[in-house]
């Protein structure tokens, strides 16, 4: 019997949704950063084995939006639960139920789909706090399964995966066996560049940045030549991103190129420029150009 289905992974920003997706797949598809709200699109990732296929939707964190990009991110996350077979709600040990989690759980209480509670980052918190969190959430609503994990250290992730498969219906292969994501290569490349920028830049810049792939061509010898714009909203941010003598931008580009080469399994020649696009997060035109809106 072949089982298949769709799984929505939801939660507040920075609870480890992307880390979990990447750990399950063994591939770096979703952007991972210590800063919240780094995932901006629903990333559809595919895990295929001999007897099952799981399709994961790694969603943006649900939060109170402050601009049009934020509105898009929240809408993308909320609509991801409409047509799935299983909802995986992720949180972290905090003892009390946060207002952000309460908002999400209220929307899940009447769901006809099974909902898993996954408590992530148990390796970073005292057992007493983990136990208190489990008690608080299990009393708040009924969950199909409750699994404490550490996505970063892969603790209990295999157990979670086994339970996911258990809840999947019998079904077809929705995607080819060798397919791991339905997003275009250009999108993954842009996300890799953005991830490196998020990790290397100061707090004041990151959420105002985006990456625009201008050109991506493969030569006859197999080398990819990629030109990209790293967009920011303020002139002052441009200098921070470039850094003294261009060193910061060079570091971002070097780290990004290394990961892009792993993803494409080919040599990469990457050129990145910094451009100022004021208030791009509130521009419908720019959001469409960058692929955040249809």
From Swiss-Prot:
One Pfam family from the record: KH_2
Region (G5): 149-151
Keywords, alphabetical: Cell membrane, Cytoplasm, GTP-binding, Membrane, Nucleotide-binding, Ribosome biogenesis, RNA-binding, rRNA-binding
Gene Ontology cellular component terms for the protein in this record: cytosol; plasma membrane
Binding site for GTP: 11-18, 58-62, 120-123
Residues of the KH type-2 domain: 201-278
UniProt superkingdom: Bacteria
All residue ranges annotated as the Era-type G domain in the record: 3-170
Cystine residue pairs: none
Chief place of localization: cytoplasm
Gene Ontology MF terms: GTP binding; GTPase activity; ribosomal small subunit binding; small ribosomal subunit rRNA binding
InterPro entries linked: G_ERA_dom, GTP-bd, GTPase_Era-like, KH_dom-like_a/b, KH_dom_type_2, KH_sf_prok-type, P-loop_NTPase, Small_GTP-bd
Compartment annotation: Cytoplasm; Cell membrane
Topology of this chain in the membrane: Peripheral membrane protein
Chain intervals for the UniProt region annotation (G2): 37-41
Family: Belongs to the TRAFAC class TrmE-Era-EngA-EngB-Septin-like GTPase superfamily. Era GTPase family.
Protein name per its UniProtKB record: GTPase Era
Protein's gene: era
